[in-house]
Design a protein with these regions (language model features):
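Secreted/periplasmic carbohydrate-active enzymes, especially glycoside hydrolases
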Residues: 1-171, 175-179, 214-216, 231-232, ...
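Substrate-binding/catalytic cleft of secreted carbohydrate-active enzymes
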Residues: 146-149, 156-360
Length: 360
């Protein structure tokens, strides 16, 4: 018998519908796909289609929207029938939410969640662990870092040049935190102009290198598409391996119109995508502003604090500014936070503090 091989969920809060695309290893016109939507144990919506046609589900009038403040998830039950015979059934989940941008009354383009302005604020999270490096010791450790991030008052995480295991994204969905997903950097560094729009010559990757980038970036988006927490795709960081920026930004937006595209965090800057992303250390500074896109501070901070027995290299402390006491570090953090607060009405729509773990 045939089976379900993949599902892809796309919410549309403006039309109050959920689209579920179901892939199977065969397709026959007599096959039927049925999707049931549950809120807890209660069946709240369902839809049916012929195998190969997306299932469009009208959601209830009192639909619950997903947000960091209220991360409402709906459970899904997806069934594949051959004629009237059930041949496969899988369970999943989805959320109703929308990421977009909109010009506010002062003419500044703002990030929006569910059609409401939202300042997105979170740490640069490179996903490092003291023992396993890129591998977390256990599932609880993944949860701990995300929960701590929320406890600190953040509503977003910039997942920096790393793709996490599926469990991590599920925890973000359940706990309620928005994710900016970076493409891991590759190839070489071209010229980097971070303080103005790029006027240099972009790097040309080899045919093989470009093909690898495009293949892997598509695979990342395919793999993570149905996680509601992901709000922004970030194809490049600080010019590393950056090439054909407007084309890559446009491809990303067309391939997944449900997310925002931050073309190049920290430059090189182009007038494409949904955001202009500045990096400035150590304190926040808005040295460039884009009237057509959301202007964001993609990295700042980097306050280092020496903690005995918490150092990877005991003789080398990390940080753009370094302190020896918790009070000094906290005071500096608050100083930067107050500077940032004053820059929000002037144009910043998001900020990323460096960083969750003290790595380079």
């Amino acid at each position: 018998a045939q089976s379900i091989t993949n599902i892809k969920t796309t919410p549309d809060i403006d039309l109050n519908k959920l689209t579920v695309e179901v892939a199977t290893d065969e397709k026959k016109l007599s096959d039927k796909i049925e999707v049931k939507v549950f809120d807890g144990k209660e069946l709240v919506a369902k839809g049916v289609s012929i195998n190969g046609i997306p299932v469009e589900i009208a959601m209830p009038a009192d639909v619950k929207l997903w947000s960091p403040e209220s991360p409402s998830l709906y459970d899904l039950e997806i069934s594949l029938f051959e004629g009237n015979k059930l041949v496969d059934k899988v369970k999943s989940y989805a959320a109703m939410r929308k990421f977009s941008t909109k010009r506010d009354k002062n003419g500044i383009v703002r990030l929006q969640l569910n059609n409401k302005d939202q300042f997105q604020f979170g740490p640069l999270d490179q996903g490092w662990w003291p023992d396993g490096l890129y591998t977390a010791p256990c599932d609880e450790a993944l949860v701990y870092d995300i929960q701590k991030t929320k406890d600190f008052g953040y509503n977003m995480i910039r997942k920096h040049i790393k793709v996490e295991p599926a469990r991590w994204y599920t925890h973000c969905d359940r706990l309620g935190i928005i994710v900016w997903q970076d493409m891991p950097s590759g190839d070489k560094n071209p010229e980097w102009q971070m303080r103005e729009y790029f006027t240099g010559t972009e790097k040309k990757r080899s045919t093989e290198s470009e093909a690898t980038y495009r293949k892997e970036w598509k695979e990342i988006i395919d793999c993570l598409y149905s996680y509601p927490c992901i709000g922004t795709w970030v194809p490049f960081n600080e010019a590393w391996g950056q090439f054909k920026t407007p084309e890559i930004a446009e491809w990303t937006k067309q391939y997944d119109p449900s997310r925002l595209v931050n073309p190049a965090s920290g430059g090189n800057h182009y007038t494409c995508g949904d955001m202009l992303d500045l990096h400035h250390y150590p304190g926040p500074e808005m040295f460039l502003y884009d009237a057509q896109r959301a202007t964001v501070l993609g990295e700042y901070g980097g306050i280092g604090l020496v903690l005995k027995e918490h150092l990877w290299e005991p003789d080398r402390n990390w940080g753009y500014v370094q302190f020896n006491t918790s009070k000094e570090a906290t005071d500096k953090y608050m100083e930067y936070a107050n500077v940032l607060k004053e820059l929000i009405p002037r144009g910043f729509s998001a900020a990323v503090y460096t960083q969750t773990t003290d790595v380079g």
